[in-house]
């Protein structure tokens, strides 16, 4: 996510979510991303925790500030650790116009790439935003909207999203 999208708070919320689920996971957050430094840290972490990671008992969360770095990062990481499984969660605060999203948000490029909508405590998700995400082929995985790192991260569910759309339309019609 871009600056101001809520990356740092989201990573803390994601860590809390992983650590408090029915099958808890230990989490390590890699902040202040720097390709060379972070790859060294991740390789060291992976070497120390390889068995826990492969047993899905430990998870690493890497905070990237610029999506342009992701291709180089993924290439370098896969060269160093071919067994590592990666999912990408792009963050986008709500409250953007359709035109802004179409111009500034890249198309989904990877099978394991998802979307988290942030700042839902500050602004409502609009129908035009949903349309842009659909056109850009993004799958929404999380909604985030409370400033506390202990709460406010929810899995995006079709029924709840559909209810939100219906409520929004009814409030505008009625």
How does the language model describe each region?
Residues 84-92, 109-127, 134-150:
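Conserved beta-strand/loop subsegment of P-loop NTPase cores
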Residues 133-174:
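NTP-binding/hydrolysis catalytic cores, primarily Walker-type P-loop NTPases
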Residues 10, 14:
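Hydrophobic positions on the alpha1 helix immediately C-terminal to the Walker A/P-loop
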Residues 68-75, 99-102, 125-128:
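Conserved ATPase-coupling elements of RecA-like P-loop NTPase cores
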Residues 2-3, 26-74, 81, 90-94:
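Switch II (G3) loop of P-loop NTPases
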Residues 20-21, 50-56, 79-85, 107-110, ...:
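Conserved catalytic network of the ASCE P-loop NTPase/AAA+ motor domain
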Residues 16-28:
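Post-Walker A helix-loop "phosphate-sensing" segment adjacent to the P-loop in P-loop NTPases
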Residues 7:
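Conserved lysine of the Walker
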């Amino acid at each position: 996510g871009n600056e101001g999208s809520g990356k740092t708070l989201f990573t803390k919320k994601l860590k809390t979510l992983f650590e408090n689920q029915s099958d808890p996971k230990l989490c390590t957050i890699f902040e202040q991303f720097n390709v060379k430094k972070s790859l060294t840290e991740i390789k060291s972490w992976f070497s120390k925790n390889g068995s826990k990671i492969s047993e899905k008992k430990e998870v690493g969360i890497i905070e990237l500030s610029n999506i342009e770095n992701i291709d180089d990062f993924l290439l370098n990481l896969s060269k160093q650790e071919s067994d590592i499984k990666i999912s990408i969660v792009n963050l986008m605060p709500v409250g953007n116009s359709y035109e802004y999203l179409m111009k500034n948000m890249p198309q989904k490029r990877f099978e394991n790439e998802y979307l988290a909508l942030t700042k839902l405590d500050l602004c409502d998700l609009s129908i035009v935003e949903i349309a842009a995400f659909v056109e850009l082929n993004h799958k929404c995985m999380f909604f985030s909207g409370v400033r506390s790192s202990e709460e406010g991260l929810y899995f995006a569910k079709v029924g709840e999203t559909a209810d939100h759309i219906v409520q929004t339309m009814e409030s505008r019609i009625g």
